[in-house]
Swiss-Prot record:
Subunit organization: Component of the BCR(KBTBD13) E3 ubiquitin ligase complex, at least composed of CUL3 and KBTBD13 and RBX1. Interacts with CUL3.
PTM note: Autoubiquitinated.
Cellular compartments annotated: Cytoplasm
Disease note: Nemaline myopathy 6: A form of nemaline myopathy characterized by childhood onset of slowly progressive proximal muscle weakness, exercise intolerance, and slow movements with stiff muscles. Patients are unable to run or correct themselves from falling over.
Kelch repeat positions: 159-209, 210-258, 259-305, 307-350, 352-400
Molecular function via GO: actin filament binding
Organism (species): Homo sapiens
Species lineage: Eukaryota, Metazoa, Chordata, Craniata, Vertebrata
Domain (BTB) ranges: 7-74
Tissue expr: Expressed in skeletal muscle.
Pfam families in the record: BTB, Kelch_1
Domain remark text: The BCB domain mediates the interaction with CUL3.
Protein name (database record): Kelch repeat and BTB domain-containing protein 13
Keywords of this entry: Cytoplasm, Disease variant, Kelch repeat, Nemaline myopathy, Repeat, Ubl conjugation, Ubl conjugation pathway
GO BP: actin filament organization; protein ubiquitination; regulation of the force of skeletal muscle contraction; relaxation of skeletal muscle
């Protein structure tokens, strides 16, 4: 939204003078909103003095409110930012901290957020710790933080294979969501798909720990299923919701910033560029900015609270673009040119995007991975080749510092470290044939589901 002329206010913090847009402070900070609307004598003065905050923390606050992305790495920088987010009641700064959680700072942020009463940051940091290695929880200093993390359940790697709607009279036990039980090294059944649901060429994504399925097809004519389906693991229930206005299949679905995005896709065998956004609270879809070009099945990923997709362009080019919510526009980020090779899968870790691309001459068995650092804009090729047996690399999902991939033979876990993906351990393969869509879900406590039965390949 366009702003009018700025009214600057001078703010003294930690012995330093800052000039800030008054409207920006009122919009994003509950403290200033209350202060300027109170009619107190201080609000009519030329200056506001904040004696309890640090200059560094307030500087970071202003940077975030203006849309910048300050690098907060040192402990004192993080602590000062948490203090400012809590005192100034600045949700945008709190979200920035949540989006930049790493295994290096999660324990510090969890303790600090607990001490300052920053509930959302505390909860997000606790979830991150729960999904990471056990040593992370040991770094917590506050007993209440350790107890909170101990009461949480880690996310489970889950998958669904390709299924079309089933006739009501024909029960198909293979039409299920499944999850990996890492302790027992077995895939277990989580829930049966609704009879009308199709995962063939569907968009699948999670948002708010719920699974959404949009745009599957039935039949050789690729008739689009009319409804979307949402699974809530906490209640073990499905509910239906409207499909996008533009019928589409092979769409990329992303849960981002509290909304669901259906990105591109295909209809009547023609790629489309339109993008729609679903508001779960309102229960309706609305169009947002089109992709720069028509595209189906585009890889997408989120890093640092930002949404990215890969597009293919002539001359062996994979282009990474970002959706800017504030301006409703797709912005170019970077391009990667490799002979006869394009990005087919993209995942995010910290401030980097990892693009998995085929080898030359349509070699999909031996893939390469390139890393785009968003802070520097530089590409780095991971050393060696990665075996992509039965498309396992295209099922990649990141949890903490670990990449999960799966096919019929095994589930492989990789540690992201030292500029590469190091094979960490091997688990059971998915026991059913077909292309897989994978995701993370946090499952409620209770008896584990039955071990998933094996279905023979046709």
């Amino acid at each position: 939204m366009a702003r009018g002329p700025q009214t600057l206010v001078q703010v003294w913090v930690g012995g330093q003078l800052f000039q800030a847009d008054r409207a920006l402070l009122v919009e994003h900070c509950g403290f200033f909103r209350g202060l300027f609307r109170s009619g107190m004598r201080e609000t009519r003065a030329a200056e506001v003095r904040l004696g309890v905050l640090s200059a560094g923390g307030f500087r970071a606050t202003l940077q975030v409110l203006r849309g910048d992305r300050p690098a907060l790495a040192a402990e004192d920088e993080l602590l000062q930012a948490v203090e400012c987010a809590a005192f100034l009641q600045a949700p945008a700064l709190a979200r920035f901290l949540e989006h930049n959680l790493t295994s290096d700072n999660c324990a510090l942020l969890c303790d600090a957020a607990a001490a300052f009463g920053l509930r959302d940051v505390f909860h997000s940091a606790a979830l991150f710790i729960c999904d990471g290695e056990r040593e992370l929880a040991a770094e917590l200093a506050l007993p209440e933080a350790r107890a909170y993390v101990a009461a949480l359940r880690p996310s489970s790697y889950a998958a669904v294979s390709t299924h079309t709607p089933a006739p009501g009279f024909l029960e198909d036990a293979s039409r299920t969501l499944c999850y990996l039980d890492e302790e027992e090294d077995a895939w277990r059944t989580l829930a049966a798909l609704p009879l009308e649901a199709s995962t063939l060429l569907a968009g699948v994504a999670t948002l708010g720990n719920k699974l959404y399925i949009v745009g599957g097809v039935r039949g050789a004519s690729k008739e689009v299923v009319e409804l979307g389906f949402c699974y809530d693991p906490d209640g073990g229930t499905w509910h239906e919701f409207p499909s996008p206005h533009q019928p589409r299949y092979d769409t990329a679905l992303a849960g981002f910033d509290g909304r669901l995005y259906a990105i591109g896709g295909e209809f009547q065998r023609t790629p489309i560029s339109s993008v729609e956004r679903y508001d779960p609270a309102a229960g309706c879809w609305s169009f947002v900015a089109d992709l720069p070009q028509p595209a189906a099945g585009v890889p997408c990923a989120q890093a640092c609270g930002r949404l990215f997709v890969c597009l293919w362009r002539p001359a062996d080019t994979t282009a990474v673009v970002e959706y800017a919510v504030r301006t409703d526009a797709w912005l170019p980020v970077a391009e990667l040119r490799r002979p006869q090779s394009y990005g087919h899968c993209m995942v995010a870790h910290r401030d980097s995007l990892y693009v998995v691309r085929n080898g030359p001459s349509d070699d999909f068995l031996h893939c390469a991975i390139d890393c785009l650092n968003l802070a520097t804009g530089q590409w780095t090729a991971l050393p060696g080749q990665f075996v992509n047996s039965k498309g396992a690399l295209f099922t990649a999902v990141v949890r903490g510092d670990t990449v999960y991939t799966v096919n019929r033979m095994f589930t492989l876990l990789y540690a992201i470290e030292g500029g590469t993906w190091r094979l960490l351990r091997e688990k059971a393969g998915f026991p059913r044939p077909g292309s897989l869509q994978t995701f993370l879900l946090r499952l409620p406590p209770g008896a584990p589901g039955p071990v998933t039965s094996t279905t023979a390949e046709l």
